[in-house]
Design a protein with these regions (language model features):
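Detector for the c-type heme attachment site
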Residues: 64-69, 197, 201
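Extended, hydrophilic extramembrane loops/domains of integral membrane proteins
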Residues: 188, 194-231
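Bacterial N-terminal signal peptides that target proteins for export
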Residues: 1-9
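Membrane-proximal low-complexity regions enriched in glycine and acidic/polar residues
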Residues: 98-190
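Electrostatic cytochrome c docking/interface patches
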Residues: 29-54, 65-79, 210-212, 230-238
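N-terminal signal peptide c-region/cleavage motif recognized by signal peptidases
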Residues: 15-19
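The canonical Cys-X-X-Cys-His
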Residues: 56-67, 222
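Juxtamembrane interface at the cytosolic side of transmembrane helices
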Residues: 237-271
């Protein structure tokens, strides 16, 4: 029985790299992007995070909030790494909508919302009924291995960033109306139709670093930024995991040598 289980597990692992079934079924197409932060030693590309922040600010922020992301983290070394004065200026210029979640920013004496400061979070934005994007990269899965096993995540991660980028480039241009709502065909969305109009077309923003701003690159940049927003401490966790594995390896080696030195000579002896 155990032999059969071992053979089955080995067979599943052999198939895992090739198995890339989309989350929720086989009718989605999730493209496998080569993000810099993937893998055990991957790190965020600071320039890409800055470009993604620009895409969010100039495009996505019109409908989506990031209310669980502190503005001060934009200066983090492992994040976008903006200078502190630039973060303060960015915060002060960010528009705040009149929503219940933003009431703590309301100045009753001046009868208006006060400007944001770097110790605040990004403001909430539910005006269009759109979801908050703070944790969207963790709540969406692009890859699954053989059903129920989750083996593909071992090699590729859950694919939240891939799902977001694939969604951005997955619009086919086809539209239909259902119950008075315009739906847009999207090859990455479950069911194939989504109520969100295409947010990106390519050349939507002008990057200061001169980087290509076609649709594919804009999609990659916003996906990477949202992955950082959801997992700002990913690099620290990877480092801690590496140190933990190294420590356990050394400990296991010492225990083996101790056993060999102290107990191995006495094993098998008859008393």
């Amino acid at each position: 029985m155990f032999k059969n289980l071992a053979i089955g597990a080995a067979f599943a692992l052999a198939l895992a790299p090739a198995a890339s079934f989309a989350a929720g079924g086989g009718d989605q197409h999730i493209e496998d992007f080569a993000f810099s932060f993937e893998g055990p030693f991957g790190t965020y590309d600071q320039n890409q995070l800055q470009r993604g922040l620009q895409v969010y600010t100039e495009v996505c922020a019109a409908c989506h909030g990031l209310q669980y992301v502190p503005l001060r983290t934009l200066a983090d070394e492992g994040g976008p790494g903006l200078p502190e004065d630039q973060v303060r200026a960015y915060a002060a210029g960010f528009a705040v909508l009149d929503e219940e979640a933003n009431r703590y920013l309301y100045d009753a004496e001046k009868d208006e919302f006060r400007p944001l400061i770097d110790s605040d979070h990004f403001p909430a934005n539910h005006a269009a009924g759109a979801p908050d994007l703070s944790l969207i990269a963790k709540s969406r899965a692009g890859f699954h291995g053989p059903y129920g096993l989750g083996i593909n995540q071992l090699f590729k991660g859950i694919g939240g960033a891939e799902y977001i980028a694939s969604l951005m480039i997955g619009y086919t241009g086809e539209e239909k109306e259902e119950a008075g709502t315009i739906l847009y065909e999207n090859t990455a969305f479950p069911g194939g139709w989504i109520s969100m109009a295409p947010p990106l077309y390519g050349e939507d923003v002008e990057y200061a670093d001169g980087h290509s701003n076609d649709l594919h690159h804009e999609a990659e940049d916003i996906a990477a930024f949202l992955m950082w927003a959801a997992e700002p401490k990913m690099m620290a966790r990877k480092q801690a995991g590496f140190v933990g594995v190294l420590f356990l390896t050394i400990l296991a080696s010492l225990l083996y040598l101790t056993n060999k030195r102290l107990w191995a000579p006495h094993k098998g002896k008859k008393h």
